[in-house]
Amino acid sequence: MLCCYDGLSAVRLIRAEHDITLMERATGTKSLEAMAVNGEDLEATQIICRVVCDLHKAPLPTGVPDLSETFAPLLSAASHPIFDACVTSARALLSDPAKVALHGDIHHENILESTRGWLAIDPKGRIGPPQYDFANLFLNPHTNTAFVLDPARMRNLANWISKTTGIDEICILHAAHAHAGLSACWNSNDPENQEYPLTAANLLHEILHS
């Protein structure tokens, strides 16, 4: 995926051999996580949006999994009121015909400051609707759960992302709701860690239906 981005708002891949990669360093002093929890959440979100919009300009790569494969665990999850609601949002997300080269794991720690500006690192690579790349912001910064699980902050995020990217707020919220359910599925054998995304999924469901 780094080759696909060719340095546009992403670190440059300098060399790759077998399982070893040499990448451009991004060693700025600012942190998007610190900005978000210290009164600059809007500014941090706008930076993330600009980076992601640049990433989505990349041509669609070959051999990259479709987002539907990522959601297979949720779509096949045992019936549960929360999961059932998240499945509905996942189907709404996956039915969107828009397709871009998704980073697949956008959060505050995966965009770093550099001499070239803010750059994304560690892409997972998927093909799917652009709103999915903003879904993980509704679970992050994960080190401050009280901050993240604030319904007012969730509403603000959807509004800020929509205004910056032009993506419909409801589409953004469906993506976030679906991703929270997926995250809960990934943690199905770890009840302690599952509680966090389940709580987020509940809150996002309430926002979607308010």
Predicted region positions:
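Active-site acidic catalytic loop and adjacent metal/ATP-binding pocket
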Residues: 13, 87-132
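Conserved NTP-binding catalytic cores of kinases and kinase-like/nucleotidyltransferase enzymes
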Residues: 1-16, 114-115, 200, 204-210
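Small/polar glycine-rich anion-binding or flexible loop at a beta-alpha turn
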Residues: 174-181
